[in-house]
Design a protein with these regions (language model features):
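Membrane-interface junctions at the ends of membrane-embedded or membrane-associated helices
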Residues: 1-4, 72-85, 141-152, 257-258, ...
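Start-transfer (signal-anchor) and selected internal transmembrane alpha helices
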Residues: 1-15, 71, 75-99, 123-173
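Transmembrane catalytic cores of multi-pass membrane glycosyltransferases
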Residues: 10-66, 169-219, 227-243, 250, ...
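Transmembrane alpha-helix segments characteristic
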Residues: 89-104, 270, 452-475
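Hydrophobic/aromatic-rich transmembrane helices and adjacent perimembrane loops
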Residues: 119-133, 340, 479-526
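Extracytoplasmic
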Residues: 123-126, 337, 387-395, 537-701
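Transmembrane-helix signature of polytopic, membrane-embedded enzymes
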Residues: 251-280, 315-320, 399-400
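Signature aromatic-anchored transmembrane alpha helix within multi-pass, membrane-resident enzymes
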Residues: 372, 376-380, 453-454, 507-558
């Protein structure tokens, strides 16, 4: 009863504090913004100071309040024991389950992503019948997993099936050319990920020649692509598939280590994989999240798994030094997700020491100090590495504006931030809170007794890890609150509900055993059994949903082959060949002109798909400028004109979109620069980046 009171009071306090924070003004200096941000972007700037405060403050405050209320209600229970009877506990436990059930119904009926939307988005329109059938079908395997004693055989079967799924996903994903599609959403988001890699591969430097929103991953990718044979679409597909398979492997290994029931582990991990990295149903490949932002939290899961199974203290010490370097590497890859990895790892180390030594031990405080120091060291190694690579490539150093360009643009300026509405995120947060609700009471009990923890460390360590990853990764949705953006976190909830089933099952068995004993407590045991069964049913429905999605994706791929839903998004309108795209037409036009009219010299491409065109024509990026896809500031737009002025002896190609923005942002600067050139040719092209015909203007120096 103490824990239920603590949970309710913590939630109520957080809701009240969150409501008060909603009145915090943004205090944005729009006059200053107008001086530096281009009009198109300024119209989409929606700074969310209040929402950011709510997220950061309440994420930290909730567990603190929970633990504080536990200690408060413990003292109250000694003075007023009638407030904390077993009967009241059974009532409030049922009320909690009832509230969660009502919230699920409301979200599926009234939210920004209702049942019909989710049904079509994930379940091919089959919906609830498939969910229920899947939930029923996995009851027997779960029961069998709890009964079997042949652990070695289970492990072998587990990894054979996991390997088959990982190979299946790799083959399907690695066969795709992400440029060869007429789906603008897919190509546009892929291009934002790809062009920095191509630019780095041709000798350009992040922060000097261009700014990259998503971090310094291009340096790592270029190194891998060189091993594969170079920066091209075939190797890029292999790289993406490899990263996604690594993420899937991390989910499988984490589940194998921390689930006792290996069948349940396989079901949860498979559901997580197909709801996240192996989303092979529709064209929802958002490369900026899977694999870019998801890889570091996944690596954190595998690092924690390995550390957990290591028993030798010396091996653990060496491994934790290695982990410090790994997470510095993660920060270098992508700072936003890298910092989540650093926090999760530090939290895990502290939790392990709390389990080992209790809360009164100096060892715990030493562990906290070490975790802070190693986290700072990881950040320092990241910053030093960035500066060394930049200086080695360009002979210059870069500052915070270049290192944290994406963070300062989006979170700092509020670009494309959206208010959070009533949606699925509520259910995902409930899963995170449920994970902490399993852990925090047991930690509080151990702290009160002044002893080291003697409970189920395996289950609770996993729940803690997933909850911290979930709350950390939720920051992405807080900023970019598109209804579907929160779907990238469903995999965390799937793994959590699997672990919750494993935790609830022994409780249910205990209550059923008590029901068989004839005494006055049978009604209470029955009430507890009903509540626990309801929790398990809710969790089973989530697992049923994830399992049905995985099954339908695999069946669709196996049954329909090259005509599967997934494959159809890579079929060009022209049907000429699998790798054909309309971008090839533009590249051919530019190549033909340069050979006939420009002595074979590649013009500077100040166009939207510049990296693709240069790749097709086997040319390097021969100018330093910010790509149109990342134009946020006036200075970004001016980089096109700057490169025209820097070298007045070379031809250049510019498109309608760029000219429109340049004319709006710096018309005089453009007119002055273009005086040194004459228009040589106009290419008209049906561009996938905008409906209708686009024009591409080829300018040559006047002396030519």
């Amino acid at each position: 009863m103490i824990y239920i009171y603590s949970l309710y009071y913590s939630v109520i306090c957080c809701v009240f504090i969150g409501y008060l924070l909603s009145f915090v003004p943004n205090n944005v200096d729009l006059a200053q913004y107008k001086q530096i941000i281009i009009p198109e972007v300024l119209a989409e700037c929606k700074p969310e100071r209040a929402e950011n405060l709510q997220y950061y403050l309440l994420t930290i405050l909730f567990p603190v309040l929970y633990l504080c209320f536990i200690f408060v209600f413990r003292k109250i229970s000694k003075k007023s024991p009638m407030m904390f009877t077993e009967k009241k506990y059974s009532i409030w436990e049922f009320v909690s389950v009832f509230i969660v059930g009502i919230l699920i119904i409301l979200v599926l009926k009234k939210s920004d992503t209702p049942y019909d939307y989710i049904n079509n988005y994930y379940c091919y329109g089959y919906g609830l019948p498939i969910w229920l059938l899947s939930a029923l079908l996995i009851v027997f395997p779960l029961w069998l997993g709890n009964k079997t004693r042949r652990k070695t055989l289970c492990g072998i079967i587990y990894w054979m099936l996991a390997a088959a799924i990982l190979v299946f996903a790799f083959v399907r994903i690695s066969s795709k050319n992400y440029m060869a599609t007429d789906d603008y959403y897919l190509t546009h988001h892929y291009y934002a990920w790809w062009y920095p890699i191509f630019k780095v591969s041709t000798g350009q430097t992040i922060g000097i020649d261009f700014n990259n929103i998503y971090g310094f991953y291009p340096y790592i990718c270029v190194g891998v692509l060189k091993l594969l044979g170079g920066a091209n679409q075939e190797n890029a597909a292999i790289l993406i598939a490899s990263l996604l398979v690594i993420i899937g492997f991390c989910y499988y290994l984490f589940s194998f280590v921390f689930f006792k029931n290996k069948i349940l582990a396989f079901i949860a991990a498979t559901g997580a994989c197909f709801l996240a990295p192996f989303d092979l149903f529709k064209n929802r490949f958002y490369i900026q999240y899977f694999p870019t932002r998801a890889i570091v939290p996944a690596v954190a899961m595998i690092m924690i798994s390995v550390d957990y199974i290591l028993k030798n203290n010396k091996a653990k010490s060496f491994f934790r030094v290695f982990a410090c370097l790994v997470f510095a590497f993660g920060l270098f890859w992508n700072f936003e997700s890298g910092i989540i990895g650093v926090i999760v790892w530090a939290g895990y180390i502290i939790l392990e020491k709390a389990f080992d030594y209790g809360f009164d031990s100096k060892n715990l405080w030493m562990a906290i100090a070490k975790a802070i120091v190693t986290s700072v060291l990881s950040i320092a190694v990241f910053l030093i590495t960035v500066e060394i690579i930049t200086y080695q490539r360009a002979g210059k150093l870069i500052g915070k504006d270049e290192i944290f360009f994406g963070i300062l643009t989006f979170e700092g300026k509020g670009f494309f931030l959206l208010p959070i509405t009533f949606g699925v995120w509520i259910l995902i947060i409930i899963s995170f809170v449920s994970a902490l609700n399993m852990l925090l009471p047991k930690l509080a009990l151990a702290a009160e007794k002044g002893k080291k923890f003697d409970g189920d460390r395996q289950n609770l360590t996993a729940l803690f890890t997933l909850a911290i990853i979930g709350f950390g990764a939720f920051s992405y949705f807080v900023g970019r609150s598109y209804p579907t953006n929160v779907f990238v976190l469903i995999y965390v909830s799937v793994l959590i509900v699997g672990l919750l089933i494993e935790a609830y099952y022994p409780q249910l068995k205990e209550q059923i055993t008590l029901l068989k004993v004839k005494n006055n407590n049978r009604k209470l045991s029955a009430a507890h059994a009903v509540s626990i069964s309801s929790k398990i049913i809710i969790c089973m429905l989530v697992l049923g949903f994830s399992t049905s999605n995985a099954a339908m994706i695999m069946l669709d791929s196996l049954k329909n082959g090259a005509n599967s839903t997934f494959d159809n998004y890579w079929v060009s309108d022209t049907k000429k060949d699998p790798d054909y795209t309309r971008i090839n037409e533009l590249a051919g036009e530019i190549k033909s002109w340069s050979e006939k009219e420009n002595d074979g010299k590649n013009p500077r491409l100040l166009i939207y798909w510049a990296a693709f065109v240069n790749e097709i024509n086997h040319e390097k990026t021969n100018y330093s400028a910010c790509e149109q896809i990342d134009w946020f500031y006036y200075d970004n737009v001016k980089t096109y004109v700057d490169c025209i002025n820097d070298d007045k002896t070379q031809a250049f190609v510019i498109d309608t979109q760029a000219l429109s923005k340049i004319s709006e942002c710096c018309p005089d600067y453009w007119q002055e620069a273009v005086k040194n050139y004459r228009l040589a040719k106009v290419i008209k092209w049906d561009d996938i980046s905008a409906p209708g015909e686009q024009e591409y203007y080829i300018f040559v120096p006047i002396q030519k």
